[in-house]
A protein has these predicted regions:
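Glycine-rich helix-loop "coupling/hinge" segments at transmembrane-helix boundaries
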Residues: 127-129, 157, 205-248, 274
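Transmembrane alpha-helix signature in integral membrane proteins
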Residues: 63-98, 252
Length: 274
């Protein structure tokens, strides 16, 4: 599969963008010329120079340093959240497809209830109850979006349940746990990985949306969404303060989406031909 990915330009571009963002997130303290939260009002709205390569914001904070540290929040929250959602989706979704009509009906109705409300509204409500904090942001995103993951896994699982290899496994006396982990999950995993890879972008955008609205993170946190919010007052005089974090969000989301599309074309070629 790696060989096939390397033959696709969109996969290479996507992987390069993802790698750059991850390296920046890990090495932000090394690359940052200043403390991202250091306020220096005497340098307010300073123009780019050797000391401040991208200038400063309304409080004299180094824009480049804040952008570099912003990658830590976007990646550091989104990837663990996607891992948790993937585990929940795989376990609950496959259980729903295998456990019988009553359990399946209950889980389906529960998912429909959550999906009926916009994910952002649910997440905002959860943050309102739990308060600020990185853990609370992660919890709110999980609560707001778990139903989508369960639903998509259940859909894949139901399609597989009628196939011959599943029927053969049942006839041979395979119990539900063995059926799920040995037969069902390995066969739906390629499709699910495609869904997860494109879901990273949505998670990053949701986290940035919280910060833009002033939710979840303390004031002054160097996060891309928060930087967009802070720069609104300087929209016309210093538009670059909005362009920089907006571009970071766009590039990161585009990297994961490009990689997800390439992965889909390889693992699910039947959809690409439609």
């Amino acid at each position: 599969m790696i060989h096939k990915l390397l033959k696709r330009p969109q996969a290479i571009i996507g992987l390069c963008l993802i790698a750059i963002v991850i390296v920046i997130a890990i090495a932000a303290p090394v690359f940052s010329p200043h403390d991202p939260e250091l306020v220096n009002l005497s340098q307010k709205y300073a123009q780019p120079d050797a000391e401040y390569p991208l200038g400063t914001d309304q409080l004299g904070r180094c824009t480049l340093s804040r952008l570099l540290y912003g990658a830590r929040y976007s990646i550091g929250i989104s990837l663990p959240v996607l891992l948790i959602l993937s585990v929940i989706g795989l376990i609950v979704g496959t259980f729903s497809a295998c456990a019988g009509e009553k359990a399946d009906h209950f889980i389906t109705i529960l998912c429909d209830v959550f999906i009926a409300f916009p994910s952002l509204i649910i997440a905002i409500a959860v943050i309102g109850v739990l308060g600020n904090g990185l853990q609370n942001i992660a919890v709110s995103v999980v609560i707001a979006t778990w139903a989508w993951f369960v639903r998509i896994v259940r859909s894949y699982s139901v399609q597989e349940m009628g196939k011959d290899y599943i029927l053969a496994a049942r006839i041979s006396g395979c119990n539900t746990g063995k059926l799920v982990f040995r037969h069902l999950i390995p066969n739906i995993l390629p499709q699910f990985l495609v869904y997860v890879s494109t879901g990273v972008a949505s998670s990053i955008i949701m986290v940035s949306s919280f910060a833009f609205l002033g939710l979840g993170l303390p004031s002054g946190t160097p996060e891309w969404g928060a930087m967009l919010n802070d720069a609104r007052t300087a929209l016309y005089s210093h538009p670059e303060l909005l362009i920089y974090p907006g571009l970071c969000i766009f590039v990161t989301a585009a990297g994961f989406n490009l990689f997800g599309e390439a992965l889909r074309d390889i693992l699910m070629p039947e959809e690409d031909s439609l």
